[in-house]
Amino acid sequence: MASRYDALIIGAGHNGLVCAAYLARAGRRVLVLERDDIVGGAARTQEVFPGFSFSVFSYVVSLLRPEIIRDLDLPRHGLHILPLDSTVTPLPNGDYLGQWGDHDQNRRELARHSLRDAEAYDDFGLLMHQMARAVKPLLAMTPPDPAARSPRHLMGLAKLGSYFRGLGRERFHVLHKLLTMSSADYLDEWFETEALKATKSASGIIGTFLGPRSPGTAYVLLHHYMGEIDGVFRAWGFAKGGNGSVSAAIAAAAREAAPRSAPVHRWRKCSLQTAAHAVSCSKTAKKSGRVWSFPAPIRGAPSCGSWAPRTCPAIS
């Protein structure tokens, strides 16, 4: 393994692997450091019981940006997504609420619980679809610094303001509600059935440490309407082989793009030194112009201590 790289990435979660793949495609020499035996971070597949493997953290696919799938050609590297067609919410009285991909079947199921909710559901879905389409481009923007006076940040603020102005008064009002309200309060404005509101509220708290009554969770609900699979908006699916296959495909793309790099190596401990220009691993310092840490930035420069380098079997 070389001692000098253009970039060191600490943490082989799916975000770190995507970063490594794009840097490698740009011709950079990249080293990814991972302390675990398995790459992928929360997007992993593990054998929990002998002979049975599971997606132990992240369990569905939808918010993986389609341009990443295209750029890295992930299907060629083994990514295959199976559509998620239906879900079911069991109820305390022994009944259930089903959610189906088929429009008519879904409407009949909702009408079984509430005719009013069945009538409102299409309008709700259309509005959420429109708002998700309107907001999704912002996710690809680098947010400007409102306190900066540089032309780049001032232009960014002007562009952002123009974008919101272009939404129009009505949609901007809806966006304001989605950004500030709780998912429970927002759903109360649309539906009467507790089973339906509870089912939808779950999408407002996924990935948070909040409850459905927490302000801002209405946006999390909206965010989960931004998913896309094979050009189908608001589609969700399961990765064949578990969500670890998503990370494995990204790692394979990074490895293919980086013949001069060492895509992923396993290390128990690393020490950041000299203003993020070197990371000590094992007995040798790996010099780098840039250091990225996933999921959190490294602070300080602790002493090296003892080192135990091992190549990650999931990649090498």
List where the protein language model places each region.
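Short helix-loop-beta connector
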Residues: 1-4, 273
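Flexible loop/turn segments at secondary-structure boundaries
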Residues: 38-42, 206-209, 269-271, 300-304
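A short, glycine/Asx- and small/polar-enriched loop/turn
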Residues: 93-95, 211-215, 271-278
